[in-house]
Amino acid sequence: ALTAEVSRGRRVIDASGLYVLPGIIDPHTHLGLAVPFGQELESETRSAILGGVTTIGTYFNQPGSYLPVIDRLRREVSQLSRVDMIPHSALREQQQIDELPLYSRQGMNSFKVYMCGVPGLYPHQEDGFIIRLMQRMKQLPPTAHPILSIHCENTSICDYATEDMQSQPLDTLADWNRTHPNLAEGEAVRRAAYFAREMGVRTYVVHSSTREAMEALAADKHPNLYVETTSPYLCLDTDSPIGAYGKMLPPIREPESRKALWDGIRSGLIDTIGTDNTVLTAGEKQVSSGMREAGAGYPTLGTHLVSVLDEGIYRQELPIEKLVPLMTMNPARIFGVYPRKGTILPGSDADLVLVDLRAARTVDPRPLLS
């Protein structure tokens, strides 16, 4: 409780003229895809904390049961992470659905499926699998607040589009965009929204990237449906001069889609801003091999907050009060860690970020420690 007596800290920071924000929550990261989880956990959470991100949601992925690895993952997070973590588990097999109650008892209540997979990493799941998973989630205790993240792209459309591009030039971000068309995301978002409504399961649409997705969500937004976009989609488009460094899944989109995402933030359609952080070194990215062979994804934790504030405040002319809840309070509420996280209240964790909106700096990757 607040009292008249406040003890003096060991260090006093003069925050005059600065914004004091709750620690930023990035609900969407991937760690341990190319190297062991513990190795990336140490480097990327170090970069996160330097960028003002104090809590991350990380999507774990493996075949078979998660039960044998939960204790190891918990131990690695405790020993190596500089930030707190919200665990999400990607599900791909019936055994994992059967074990949901056991995962829930271990504190894993956030799950994920891919309507369109990532070759070599994540298989796609058929609609029947998703419905069966939702049915099982409804049997979990309501106090667990289970939630299902869905990667929304129509896998058949993406497969055909990718096949068509095999005989076409694939040199630019616009070319890469054509392998995963906007249509594929718009259609899949409509399905996910319908499933969430009919099944009564809290559903989180990850990394929304297109105008078509915004139109679909605006037509069927309901209390069980939450919408995420990411800082790369808000700050970059197919006209950005970054070449294969910008290769992602889903792709960075055309300027019209980027505008639609900012309109979604203005209207309140979008609930959260994450990163979809994926760690690749320059060598692993293989940019020199061209767009077709380059790896998808790149690390963004260290520049996430400053990118959103720079673009949102100075180019989109939005107040900071409009942006901060999408990176603090909203993800905290959605993933069940509010009010411990996402706000500055008596009893909340003292995760604080000081922001100087007057400072101008050029991004240098060396201090980011990723």
Question: What are the language-model segments listed below?
Answer:
Residues 17, 28, 48, 52, ...:
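Divalent metal-coordination and catalytic microenvironments
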Residues 95-273:
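Histidine/acidic residue-rich metal-binding segments in metalloenzymes
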Residues 1-21:
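Histidine-rich, glycine-flanked metal-binding segment
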Residues 364-370:
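A conserved acidic, glycine/proline-rich C-terminal tail/linker
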Residues 23-34, 148-152, 208, 275:
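Histidine-centered catalytic micro-motifs
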Residues 25-29, 50-58, 166-177:
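Gly-rich Lys/Arg/Thr-decorated short loops/hinges at beta-loop-alpha junctions or inter-strand turns
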Residues 171-191, 195-200, 245, 267, ...:
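His/Asp/Glu-enriched, well-ordered alpha-helical/loop segment
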Residues 18, 35-87, 92-109, 128-142, ...:
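Alpha-helical scaffold segments that flank or form the walls of functional sites
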